Amino acid sequence: MSDAAVDTSSEITTKDLKEKKEVVEEAENGREAPANGNANEENGEQEADNEVDEEEEEGGEEEEEEEEGDGEEEDGDEDEEAEAATGKRAAEDDEDDDVDTKKQKTDEDD
């Protein structure tokens, strides 16, 4: 009979493993795991973005050879991507800058 007794307190369920995996992915990706628990949906979007980047890199190599002297344009593309990713923060920062500017003007007038 002792063989039939199973200690369930030390067993790890599949659900627990999935939750732990989501937490690890969240930490690695720097963002929250999908609320619906379907990580494939979010990863699918990420994979699509990666495919576009690869296509741009392949096409971009030819352009780089033609425009070796115009390195500024390459840097501009990276800046635009960074701004697009943080567009909401940039808008919030602009509002803060306006407030700071107004404060500086009133301080100068005094």
Curated annotation (Swiss-Prot):
Compositionally skewed regions (Acidic residues) per UniProt: 42-83
Region listing for Disordered, in residue ranges: 1-110
Residue positions, PTM N-acetylserine: 2
Modified residues (Phosphothreonine): 8, 13-14, 101, 106
GO cellular component: nucleus
Post-translational modification: Covalently linked to a small RNA of about 20 nucleotides.
Compositional bias (Low complexity): 32-41
Modified residues (Phosphoserine): 2, 9-10
One of the GO biological process terms: positive regulation of transcription by RNA polymerase II
UniProt keyword annotations, A-Z: Acetylation, Isopeptide bond, Nucleus, Phosphoprotein, Ubl conjugation
Cross-link Glycyl lysine isopeptide (Lys-Gly) (interchain with G-Cter in SUMO2), where in sequence: 102
UniProt xrefs under InterPro entries: Pro/parathymosin (IPR004931)
Subcellular location: Nucleus
Taxonomy, superkingdom: Eukaryota
GO molecular function terms listed in the Swiss-Prot or TrEMBL record: DNA-binding transcription factor binding; histone binding
Pfam family, one: Prothymosin
Similarity section: Belongs to the pro/parathymosin family.
Subunit structure: Interacts with NUPR1; regulates apoptotic process.
Role of this protein: Prothymosin alpha may mediate immune function by conferring resistance to certain opportunistic infections.
Name used for this protein in its record: Prothymosin alpha
Species for this entry: Bos taurus
